[in-house]
Curated annotation (Swiss-Prot):
One of its GO terms (cellular component) is cytosol. CDD domains: ProRS-INS, ProRS_anticodon_short, ProRS_core_prok. The keyword Disulfide bond does not apply. Keywords: Aminoacyl-tRNA synthetase, ATP-binding, Cytoplasm, Ligase, Nucleotide-binding, Protein biosynthesis. Pfam families: HGTP_anticodon, tRNA-synt_2b, tRNA_edit. Catalyzes the attachment of proline to tRNA(Pro) in a two-step reaction: proline is first activated by ATP to form Pro-AMP and then transferred to the acceptor end of tRNA(Pro). As ProRS can inadvertently accommodate and process non-cognate amino acids such as alanine and cysteine, to avoid such errors it has two additional distinct editing activities against alanine. One activity is designated as 'pretransfer' editing and involves the tRNA(Pro)-independent hydrolysis of activated Ala-AMP. Belongs to the class-II aminoacyl-tRNA synthetase family. ProS type 1 subfamily. This is Proline--tRNA ligase. Its main location: cytoplasm. It catalyses: tRNA(Pro) + L-proline + ATP = L-prolyl-tRNA(Pro) + AMP + diphosphate. The keyword ATP-binding applies.
């Protein structure tokens, strides 16, 4: 590729609305341009990196036995109504009508369409397992698109869907996809972690997210530095921090706490550790034709409620936070001084595992400006329902028993789900088993955010000059920067020879023949992030040398001109092999 025949749209300044590094650098490097909120043009530099990500994904999907197809972006509403997601999906689902008033959606995912394919094409267990995948543009109408490609509305995604005869076979398909994802992100050159996750709106029984580790990540990940354990904070099991409950050592007493409605303020006033206070959270579940059931959830003062775990407890599906009027009616006091002792009306008490093992703790007195200290289970109030209802914290014991947890931030770039029969049951996707009986197909689904990978990779790989691409997805592997290409025959001949040798060796090389000043050339390619640069100048050629500098190198080195192409080609191959 010659730069004079390519489009290089670099900018000195980032747009004012760009908040994170990847957004700023993708615009400045000429990779993307905004069309509308969360919708972008992918310019030639950006598209080259996208195609490289797609190529790696496609190779590994094919290697894992998946079969590529292509489904329509526009999907009929009837399929979504069959699955039940027409009503379940929120405003993120873009719905519209055609000229005949038929309703359609722009697909955010393709479970419905692929299930329709399977129910019409797969009739026997002999046709399974099968795994279909596509690489295609999706649309989700995000309420607040931001961060460039990291949270866009339109994006490119690889989505795959497996169909198996039973759950054991699904586990095998799932493992193949999990392993393929590990290979994909390793080949791309990302620092990542697979983490146990919640299934969210997709549904199903088991899933893992693949997160690129970055300080700007939207998700908190709990991991154990001394083992392989990692899970999204919303899914990580929180073990009890006390092995057993100590015997009571204090008498229960009412304590004045004027104006102290927060656990931190109560602990400071009483001169006790925050860990001895109890945070009370009031939820409600509605009952048709009757008053709601009120729940009091008890957490240690320094812990936070995990609503996803809470929603899975018996009786708490569809819960909501109680209104202030309900709180006053059941507890006799507004929020800030609530507790399980002396409620006005019966409430259901759920204690977190750690709280269940606490002794001599402090709770609200259900009276403004008062708390109760020295409270103990059994002696002062009934034994509670015990459940894991909190988020883990750094320092908590790892659920695998192999150390303590730490917390980092991650950017989700892939997700694998064991769907089970959620969609096949709803849409009647059945097959005939070995005994001649109709059975629902057992499904898995597997997504990778192609365009999101670019943003995530940049968040891990940048410096004050620009992007520092992992070798495998750089728009070009090598750039040739000739000093005076349009003025010096020797420079031009040497540059053209290097270009031909590198291209013949299969290296993705670009020759900057634009005639720009050295400072402009260097700044452009450092901003774009090409991993290897060769500078060809008359002075160096007189000594038989060409200047080489890797994008991550602090200093340039000199290479023999007659072997420079081979040396750089070997550097590229070595980097790709890592």
């Amino acid at each position: 590729m010659k730069a004079s025949r390519f489009f290089i749209g670099t900018l000195k300044e980032a747009p004012a609305d760009a908040e994170i590094v990847s957004h700023k650098l993708m615009v400045r490097a000429g990779m993307i341009r905004r069309v509308a909120g969360g919708i972008y043009n992918y310019l030639p530099v950006g598209l080259r990196s996208i195609r490289k990500v797609e190529a790696i994904v496609r190779e590994e999907m094919n290697r894992a036995g998946a079969i590529e197809l292509l489904m329509p972006a526009v999907q009929p509403a009837e399929l979504w109504q069959e699955s039940g997601r027409w009503e379940q999906y929120g405003p993120e689902l873009l719905r519209f009508k055609d000229r005949k008033q038929n309703e359609f959606v722009i697909g955010p995912t393709h479970e419905e369409v692929v299930t329709d394919i399977a129910r019409n094409q797969i009739k026997s267990y002999r046709q399974m397992p099968v795994n279909f995948y596509q690489i295609q543009t999706k649309f989700r109408d995000e309420i607040r698109p931001r961060f460039g490609v990291m949270r866009g509305r339109e994006f490119i995604m690889k989505d795959a869907y497996s169909f198996d005869k039973d759950h054991e076979s699904l586990k095998e398909s799932y493992k193949k996809m999990y392993d393929a994802y590990v290979r994909i992100f390793t080949r791309i050159g990302l620092e990542f972690r697979p983490v146990a996750a919640d299934n969210g709106s997709i549904g199903g029984s088991g899933s893992h997210e693949f997160h690129v580790i970055a300080d700007t990540g939207e998700d908190a990940i709990a991991y154990c530095p001394t083992s392989d354990f990692a899970a999204n904070v919303e899914a990580a099991e929180a073990l009890p921090l006390l092995a057993s409950r100590a015997a009571p050592a204090e008498a229960m007493q009412k304590v004045a706490t004027p104006g102290k409605a927060k656990c931190e303020a109560v602990a400071e006033l009483m001169g006790i550790p925050l860990e001895r206070t109890i945070k009370s959270i009031v939820l409600a579940t509605d009952n048709e034709g009757a008053e709601p059931t009120i729940w009091l959830l008890m957490l240690r003062g320094d812990h936070d409620l995990n609503e996803i775990k809470t929603a899975k407890l018996p009786g708490l599906a569809g819960h909501r936070f109680a209104t202030e009027a309900e709180i006053v009616e059941w507890f006799g006091t507004p929020p800030g001084y609530l507790g399980p002792i002396g409620t006005k009306k019966p409430v259901r008490v759920v204690a977190d595992r750690t709280v269940a093992n606490m002794s001599d703790f402090v709770v609200g007195a259900n009276e403004v400006d008062y708390h109760i200290a020295g409270v103990n289970w059994g002696r002062d109030l009934p034994e509670p329902v015990v459940a894991d209802i909190r988020n883990v914290k750094a320092g908590d014991p790892s659920p695998d028993g192999k150390g303590a947890l730490d917390i980092c931030r991650g950017i989700e770039v892939g997700h694998v789900f064991q769907l089970g029969t959620k969609y096949s049951d709803a849409m009647g996707a059945t097959f005939i088993d070995e005994s001649g009986k109709a059975q629902p197909m057992v499904m898995g689904c597997y997504g990778i955010g192609i365009t999101r990978i670019l943003g995530a990779a940049i968040e891990q790989n940048f410096d004050d000059k620009g992007i520092v691409w992992p070798e495998a997805i750089a728009p070009f592997e090598v750039v040739l920067c000739p000093m005076g290409y349009d003025r010096s025959d020797a420079v031009r001949e040497a540059a053209d020879k290097l270009y031909a040798e590198l291209a013949a060796a299969g290296i993705d090389v670009i020759l900057d023949d634009r005639g720009e000043r050295p400072g402009v050339m260097f700044a452009d390619w450092e901003l774009i992030g090409v991993p290897h640069r060769l500078v060809i100048g008359e002075r160096g050629l007189k000594d038989g040398k060409i200047e080489y500098q890797g994008r991550r190198d602090a200093e340039a080195t000199l290479l023999p001109a007659d072997s420079a192409a081979a040396a750089v080609a070997e550097k590229v191959r070595a980097a790709l092999a890592r």
